[in-house]
Amino acid sequence: MKKKLVVLGLLAVVLVLVIVGLCLWLPSASKEPDNHVYTRAAVAADAKQCLEIGRDTLRDGGSAVDAAIAALLCVGLMNAHSMGIGVGLFLTIYNSTTRKAEVINAREVAPRLAFASMFNSSEQSQKGGLSVAVPGEIRGYELAHQRHGRLPWARLFQPSIQLARQGFPVGKGLAAVLENKRTVIEQQPVLCEVFCRDRKVLREGERLTLPRLADTYEMLAIEGAQAFYNGSLMAQIVKDIQAAGGIVTAEDLNNYCAELIEHPLNISLGDAVLYMPSARLSGPVLALILNILKGYNFSRESVETPEQKGLTYHRIVEAFRFAYAKRTLLGDPKFVDVTEVVRNMTSEFFAAQLRSQISDHTTHPISYYKPEFYTPDDGGTAHLSVVAEDGSAVSATSTINLYFGSKVCSPVSGILFNNMDDFSSPSITNEFGAPPSPANFIQPGKQPLLSMCPTIMVGQDGQVRMVVGAAGGTQITTDTALAIIYNLWFGYDVKRAVEEPRLHNKLLPNVTTVERNIDQAVTAALETRHHHTQIASTFIAVVQAIVRTAGGWAAASDSRKGGEPAGY
């Protein structure tokens, strides 16, 4: 009898252990794996519901471009502080069938009545109707869809129309900016009507509905891009901007065209090619950073010991400083001859000359890097990366310029408009002693210099290896470079490449900003080499990346903005 009881007791213990084990295992087995590797297609962006919209568009037979447009329309709702249909974007597109890359430029342009000295202060270029440029976002979607779309145009709008009507919880990124811009928003009746409850800005998790934008999306879905530029929306858009003191006219909207660039900027990295936009974007800056650094033959060993890691990061920061010194010469190639500048910035010989000027034991005064002009900060961006089942890819970055752009929001259409603060102005001085860049002065029809660099890396076999880009003002270029360096040279998986603590230096001001959780060995090594370091108040930009691995497409959406990838 005693023996029987012992056996029964042991069986009971085993049964309990099995049940506990199943309880622990089953929930995790039903979840998506933490590494986010997808066998067929992937999307990385900074809003979960938008990722799911992009993924479902791919599942429904949509192309990479279809998924990008559908997801961007959603991001324009959920992260309205960063982008929307009243702004502009660039798309880098790779077609796996033709094995060709192209860029679509749909950045906003200065109105025909604009002139170089139209702003006497930064406030004028940042806020109000006068600061609004001619939006290009919808024309960009149209051109991309005409060239690469598979699903009907209207289908791409439907998920976001539903989302705008039903509402959604305010996410981490939008909530942080609403709190940061609380005073401005609560004092603007139209903005506060959208983003406030009981005259107080919405907090994370509270519900935001956008019924006016839903109506506008419906009109665009039915009428196409024409509705915005010379159709049923056009007159109201002009009226809203001019009522706020702006100079955008019907003629400006009628004449706006997105631009196809069939031969984008590219450089070699080992046995791969990196495709990105040239000037007026910061592709040449990214190219110069990587060309300088590839001469060091970085590898996993470059960051193995504190000494090696410190030297490696010093070299990276010095490459940033040289590249940003040359950035000040860039501008819109339709108005400024930047051929020689871009040729130098993408030349391995030129990069080697700059590399030879990097001292491993110290940094140098600003004048050592020979900056010629100063260009203003930019900000308020959103990026997404997409890879479709056929191996085609899109890297897209859209921007409203500064958070909430011009702060001009239509009480009728719900459209929030950009500002022109990315231009330089002869009337606005800076504290760094460098004159404003004439290459970036305002002219009618001109586009300003920007830090965006949506990038696609392709191997010799014609297959995409990496799709990457970032959002976050002038930090975009350095963060995109770091993600590539971390993955390609240091051997970090894509999740670590996106999440790894980062640093930034744009030469002016003479400060290296580091994220709070960066390795202390890096900070100590920089300070030993006379770098002025400061801890970032929040985070340094937000990266979205997809990388080809043996197991499929590994995707990472930056947790700094609450991102999470999707795929299948």
UniProtKB/Swiss-Prot annotation:
The active site is at T381. Signal peptide: none annotated. The keyword Protease applies. One of its GO terms (biological process) is peptide modification. It catalyses: an N-terminal (5-L-glutamyl)-[peptide] + an alpha-amino acid = 5-L-glutamyl amino acid + an N-terminal L-alpha-aminoacyl-[peptide]; glutathione + H2O = L-cysteinylglycine + L-glutamate; an S-substituted glutathione + H2O = an S-substituted L-cysteinylglycine + L-glutamate. Residues 27-568 are extracellular. It is a single-pass type II membrane protein. The chain crosses the membrane at residues 5-26. Pathway: Sulfur metabolism; glutathione metabolism. Its EC number is 3.4.19.13, 2.3.2.2. Glycans are attached at N95, N120, N230, N266, N297, N344, N510. Keywords: Acyltransferase, Glutathione biosynthesis, Glycoprotein, Hydrolase, Membrane, Protease, Signal-anchor, Transferase, Transmembrane, Transmembrane helix, Zymogen. PANTHER family: GAMMA GLUTAMYL TRANSPEPTIDASE, GLUTATHIONE HYDROLASE 1 PROENZYME-RELATED. This is Putative glutathione hydrolase 3 proenzyme. The lineage of its organism: Eukaryota, Metazoa, Chordata, Craniata, Vertebrata. The gene is GGT3P.
